[in-house]
Amino acid sequence: MEMIIISLCLATILALLLLKQFLNRTYTAKVNLPPSPWRVPVIGNLHQLSLHPHRSLRSLSHRYGPLMLLHFGRVPVLVVSSSDVAHDLMKTHDLKVANRPQLKVVEKIFNGGREMVFSPYGEYWRQIKSVCIVNLLNKKKVQSFEKVREEEISEMMERVEKASSDSSPLNLSELLLTLTSDVTSRVSLGRKYSKEESMSDFKIQMRKITELVGGFPVGEYIPCLAWIDKLRGVDEKAEEVSKAFGDLMEKVLQEHLDATDKPTLDFVDVLLSLERHERNGVQIRRSDIKFLILDMFLAGTETTYALLEWIMTELIRHPECMKKLQDEIRAKATKLILYISEEDVEDMKYLKAVVKEVLRLHPPLPLLVPRELSEDIKLKGYDIAAGTQVIINAWAIQRDTMTWGIDAEEFRPERHLDSLVDFRGTNFEFIPFGSGRRICPGIGFAMALVEVTLANLVNRFNWRMEVQHSGDEYDLAESTGLDVCRKFPLIVFPSPA
């Protein structure tokens, strides 16, 4: 009797599997899906991702086209690798592709994703985005932080001056990370924390976050294999960084609550005042505030630092471009000027071209933050289902020879001097900050710091790397994670100009 029951169960399971396979084939025959590489049962195409997914995805796109459908486990993932497809997706279907996938690793780190970058599209996201723009990121606010930028850059320049007088090597990567974190913490948290013991660990934890979020954990896509992530320590690391940041942000909040005689209110004060009031039916909780602050801190620190690091790397690797930039800046400055102001930078066309070229070759987020379709769409004649995750490979788009010419892989700032193509979301061949509703709202905040920092570093000093390594493997080696900086610190020798 038991054997009969077991046989019936097995037969039922087999019949269901065959029925499912038949239905899948029938569905596939009725819809027009984008080109797809063959996928392995259970894992799909996850095995085709390298440590640098933007590179492996571009290689796949060369074979399967600029619009291809992958499967990470059973999750359909649309990969966009051309400006033409990106335009149709983010211009025509912007609202339908404004959502974010709900990733478990994000929920563990960011309090269920109740911050701005990873929050689902909806009223809560609209309200917190508005709060961030009005109180931190709009043009008037960014201009009001000019004195903070000047003070922190001047302090950094003193350290460079000391290294140049001693002829000692300088870890420029560490210096730039300190600069960006100090500026961001002063304008968002009210003071800087870089001199506290906990900050060294804080910087390590920041790097861990980008690696975790950009790492495509197996358990996100194949729940039955979530144990692999546990063995790799993914869950433990996520809980560790969440606690570390939560503890620091609790300290920041308590400092603000204890302060009774503050002459001006900062971003944290504004958020704390919102805790007691609803905005259009949206209630911001104490835990939300912690991770919203963290959101702003990470966005203002990591990506800006990575951009400055890549700029200095490319300029040192291309001395002819460095000289051209120095000539432009020094023509504006005199020996009596120790600080190049933001007003001075406004007229420096070659400097802006250098920044744009580095943004093109080294976008801080090579793969834009993943999106998710909220409705079925038709894209380039293909049927794309709701719930499909969307990856936009900005790195591949910005190195496309069809758009940028045969020298697309080369560092050539001159290509931007007479070009109207900009990075603010309307030119889809150049989208380092994204486009549409989900475009990064902190572009002005980042550019204000990047341009004036670069002008001062290049004006007062000449630069050379610690060792001239052969080839690009060392000079341009990339870190792993959502945002990509140098794999190795940029060790340099500055000398007075």
From Swiss-Prot:
Gene3D superfamilies: Cytochrome P450 (1.10.630.10)
InterPro entries, A to Z: Cyt_P450, Cyt_P450_CS, Cyt_P450_E_grp-I, Cyt_P450_sf
Residues annotated for heme binding in this entry: 440
GO cellular component labels: membrane
Cofactor: heme
Gene name tied to this protein: CYP71A14
Chief localization: membrane
Family (UniProt): Belongs to the cytochrome P450 family.
The name this protein goes by in its record: Cytochrome P450 71A14
GO molecular function: heme binding; iron ion binding; monooxygenase activity; oxidoreductase activity, acting on paired donors, with incorporation or reduction of molecular oxygen
The UniProt record lists the keyword Membrane: yes
Pfam families to which the protein is assigned, alphabetical: p450
